[in-house]
Regions:
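Helix-turn-helix DNA-binding motif, specifically the short coil turn and the N-cap/start of the second
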Residues: 2-6, 10
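A short LG(V/I)-centered, amphipathic sequence patch enriched
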Residues: 15-32
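Alpha-helical linker/hinge and terminal dimerization helices associated
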Residues: 17-18, 39-61
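A late-sequence structural motif
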Residues: 80, 228-267
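Flexible hinge/capping segments at coil-to-helix
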Residues: 61, 130-141, 145-167, 250-253
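Central regulatory/effector-binding core of bacterial HTH transcription factors
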Residues: 65-126, 195-198
Length: 267
């Protein structure tokens, strides 16, 4: 245990060493500055990476064990991923998984930092740095609209239907470009009110602001909202990726090999 004076002295020494102010101090409390919050995030990543490293070396003589860190977006393909994990764990019950949810850019960033072993990414996405397996699952695009909207009565919606209507789009640039291509000449008439990376909060915003979310069909129910497919149909593929240059734990290497066999059996 450290006494308060000792801790305060060490914090001041850390500020001097880094050449930045980490805390705003008052008589009764201290508050992290932006530099302080950055240092905290980096420290959390270091701790997470240290824990992952210990997990990588955890094994028994006779049985595969350890923890595999996997990232996935909000995708229909996530169901395929959970089935893959469950099948692998039936053969390797001592292996556990740590699941991280985010969009493709978030997941790639964490793979680059060594915090994730494998990621399930939505295309289009740059995978030049990665080995990959393309899954047989296709993601289908549409809009989440208010159940009271005129669009909710349609079997599908066209670019003309969405021109001028308040829209919420995914915030990934590659995906936005794909959607703008789908809108064609109507792209100039779009009224984009918000962007975001995960659907849960965007669905609430759509319901409260009478906007439409352009999204993948996740087969999820949101009160007061209905999913309507796009026409012409728009689909996205998904890929399971891992770094080309990374040395993996025995558990992660076995899971990658298992994934290749599992997916080849689905094709």
């Amino acid at each position: 245990h450290l006494t308060q004076p000792t801790l305060s002295r060490q914090l001041m020494q850390l500020e001097e060493e880094l050449g930045v102010t980490l805390f705003r101090r008052s008589r009764h409390r201290i508050i992290l500055t932006e530099d302080g919050m950055l240092l905290r995030r980096r420290a959390e990543e270091i701790v997470s990476l240290a824990e992952k490293t210990k997990d990588d070396f955890r094994h028994t003589q006779d049985h595969l064990s350890g923890t595999i860190a996997v990232g996935s977006g909000e995708l229909q393909s996530s169901r395929f991923l959970t089935q893959l994990i469950a099948a692998f764990q039936r053969d390797n019950p001592l292996v556990s998984f740590r699941i991280y949810s985010g969009n493709s850019d978030n997941i790639k960033e964490r793979i680059e930092r060594g915090l994730l072993d494998i990621g399930l990414l939505q295309e289009p996405v740059d995978i030049s740095k990665y080995n990959f397996i393309r899954t047989p699952i296709h993601e289908h695009w549409g809009v989440l609209v208010s159940a009271e909207s005129e669009l909710a009565a349609k079997s599908n919606v066209t670019p003309a239907d969405l021109a001028g209507i308040p829209l919420i789009l995914p915030d990934r640039e590659n995906v936005q470009n794909e959607l703008l291509n789908w809108f064609g000449p109507y792209a100039e008439k779009l009224h984009i009110t918000a962007t975001g990376n995960l659907l849960y909060n965007l669905a609430f915003l759509a319901r409260d602001s009478q906007s439409c979310v352009v999204t993948l069909n996740l087969a999820c129910h949101y009160d007061g909202l209905l999913f309507v497919p796009l026409s012409p149909k728009l689909e996205s593929g998904t890929v399971l990726v891992w770094k080309k240059t990374q040395t993996f734990s025995s558990a992660a290497s076995a899971f990658i090999a298992y994934s290749k066999e599992y997916i080849s059996g689905m094709l």
